[in-house]
Amino acid sequence: MHTQKAITEALQKLGVQSGDLLMVHASLKSIGPVEGGAETVVAALRSAVGPTGTVMGYASWDRSPYEETLNGARLDDNARRTWPPFDPATAGTYRGFGLLNQFLVQAPGARRSAHPDASMVAVGPLAETLTEPHELGHALGEGSPNERFVRLGGKALLLGAPLNSVTALHYAEAVADIPNKRWVTYEMPMPGRDGEVAWKTASDYDSNGILDCFAIEGKQDAVETIANAYVKLGRHREGVVGFAQCYLFDAQDIVTFGVTYLEKHFGTTPIVPAHEAIERSCEPSG
């Protein structure tokens, strides 16, 4: 049974330091049995960064109608009328991004951003700075909490989570100067007048596949491709927390690498020939 003290010490050994800004992507199952459960993991993370540090997570929303309204799809009138508007104070988190986020949201002093589908949660001195503002059309790119996390010198922690979980790399996708980026439109239910739902349309980069070759089902997306290439450089930290294999990345460094990678292989005048770029960048290795 893993204790808070043991998890905190393992995080520190991995390279988490007092004062860090830490975005956590976690698989609680991978960590193994923890005395006190997920709340203990949150406490260990906060202990590792100390009172001057901030812990952040990608919460999203368990009622996000992203898929139901994607690229012109439309909910029926009854669903649109009865769908709850997004309320950062009460909304659940998307379980696909890990159960830990629900416990971060419930932590004392937690702040949550107002973008329903790309909602971020943060706990610590930088919580308000990170989460506000967060407008539709700025999900994970410029003007988002994700951008502020990168610019403020954050670290991305994969706590048993796979390499396709590095949310910071979606910022690299957004700012990289490459043609033919995929765009999506979708609708989100926002609070309206007198408690009514106000449906708002958003247009943004496609974080599920920034280019066509990264949007093929069963293939690596850009985030996983870039993260795998970055790990080979050895500029990150690896270790074990509980039973979980962990990676710790400097967000600015991996984002800079990601932007360069995308522009090198997919820019207007790519250094790598197009057919080789597809082979090297869009196909899974091995």
UniProtKB/Swiss-Prot annotation:
The keyword Transferase applies. Signal peptide: none annotated. It comes from the Bacteria. GO terms for molecular function: aminoglycoside 3-N-acetyltransferase activity. Its EC number is 2.3.1.81. InterPro entries: Amioglycoside_AcTrfase, Antibiotic_NAT-like. GO terms for biological process: response to antibiotic. It catalyses: a 2-deoxystreptamine antibiotic + acetyl-CoA = an N(3)-acetyl-2-deoxystreptamine antibiotic + CoA + H(+). SUPFAM superfamilies: TTHA0583/YokD-like. Keywords: Acyltransferase, Antibiotic resistance, Plasmid, Transferase. Resistance to antibiotics containing the 2-deoxy-streptamine ring including gentamicin, kanamycin, tobramycin, neomycin and apramycin. Belongs to the antibiotic N-acetyltransferase family. This is Aminoglycoside N(3)-acetyltransferase III. It comes from Salmonella sp. The lineage of its organism: Bacteria, Pseudomonadati, Pseudomonadota, Gammaproteobacteria, Enterobacterales. The gene is aacC3.
